[in-house]
Amino acid sequence: MLERLSWKRLALELFLACIPALILGAFVGHLPWFLLAAVTGLLIWHFWNLMRLSWWLWVDRSMTPPPGRGSWEPLLYGLHQMQMRNKKRRRELGSLIKRFRSGAESLPDAVVLTTEEGAIFWCNGLAQQILNLRWPDDSGQNILNLLRYPEFANYLKQRDFSKPLNLVLNNARHLEIRVMPYTDKQWLMVARDVTQMHQLEGARRNFFANVSHELRTPLTVLQGYLEMMQEQVLEGATREKALHTMREQTQRMEGLVKQLLTLSRIEAAPALAMNDRIDVPMMLRVVEREAQTLSQEKQTLIFTVDEQLKVLGNEEQLRSAISNLVYNAVNHTPPGTEIRVSWQRTPQGALFSVEDNGPGIAPEHIPLLTERFYRGDKARSRQTGGSGLGLAIVKHAVNHHDSRLEIDSTVGKGTRFSFLLPERLIARNDA
């Protein structure tokens, strides 16, 4: 086993080189000259080995050092061992960097590594999507040149990273940005897309504002009549009018609460098993009678129903969807309108539609009709007691049945609401 180079080994090597000179000097004479020749030869041999080592280090691409003898053997072997250890460390470091990058790529956030001055030296794939960075083209670019937002520049300039920065991009995307210094003069920037969270927060605020607005009117009416009753005794027609109005407002609040509970129940419902057999034709007969009562013969109702077409699904949700579409057509069309309700089988599945020849809906209202509390004709909705929740209930109910609500309308010609249940949900007649 080789050992490290020592003074004893060097001295022994010098002594062995001088032995021939001592022997020759003892027999021939001129000992100093022989010793000088031996030392010179030893120096030449060391110089030759030094040149070989230099060639291997700077020119030769071989991983194995040149063979050595004498005192050069442990030195060259030690260099070889050191090189192998460095190679192993580089391999481990490369594997560690690869695992780090793989982990960073799987993060649900955009990650950017920069210098303290903002020069980018790495980013993950999500950063390229969210921040529109190009890697490796943007390597070395200052991030302030790529994200040109004054609030972002001020955030980096102030260097107070105790709180995240909420940044709104030009495409209306909301980002939450955090910056963490993690080594000397290097920063780790993490950007999270919180657009959906902001939308949900906005929807929550709008929801409570709309609920408060919807309840304020009937409560104000009730409070007014109660104060009137407290101050004076109402008799005859005035009393009947007050009671009728309070009853209407109470029913309006009750209807609103019921629809809110229905919508909440449908939204929170887990995935449906789709095993319940639903007799839609019988359901439509009940809806037709109720719609005729609601219409009071002001509109013409025409029902075209395939009496053999039954489906699988959730009966309560499907009833909510069908009844809301039919009642909306009655409530939101003027007298004399013809309303056609159809339940037919098609090659793609079971198609339900409600079509009228009423005034139609303006195009700008159609994408918003299924939003909670949205009402295209607010004046008419107030007259009919509409809450703006019916189509939201329909949308979620048909979505649970792997379908979607389609709305087609032309101003002055009429409107058509429909949804198509997939073929696999059609019940067999022998079931």
From Swiss-Prot:
Keyword terms of this UniProt record: ATP-binding, Cell inner membrane, Cell membrane, Kinase, Membrane, Nucleotide-binding, Phosphate transport, Phosphoprotein, Transferase, Transmembrane, Transmembrane helix, Transport, Two-component regulatory system
SMART domains on file: HATPase_c, HisKA, PAS
Chief place of localization: membrane
Chain ranges of the Histidine kinase domain: 210-425
Group of enzyme by EC: transferase
GO biological process, one term: regulation of DNA-templated transcription
Cytoplasmic topological segments: 1-13, 60-431
Chain positions found as Phosphohistidine: H213
Transmembrane intervals: 14-34, 39-59
Entries under Pfam families matching the protein: HATPase_c, HisKA, PAS, PhoR
EC number of the protein: 2.7.13.3
A GO term for molecular function: ATP binding
Lipid bilayer topology: Multi-pass membrane protein
Record-annotated PAS domain positions: 98-166
GO (cellular component) term, any one: plasma membrane
Membrane-side (Periplasmic) residue stretches: 35-38
Locations listed in the record: Cell inner membrane
Catalytic activity line of the entry: ATP + protein L-histidine = ADP + protein N-phospho-L-histidine
Function field: Member of the two-component regulatory system PhoR/PhoB involved in the phosphate regulon genes expression. PhoR may function as a membrane-associated protein kinase that phosphorylates PhoB in response to environmental signals.
Protein name, as recorded: Phosphate regulon sensor protein PhoR
Origin species: Klebsiella pneumoniae
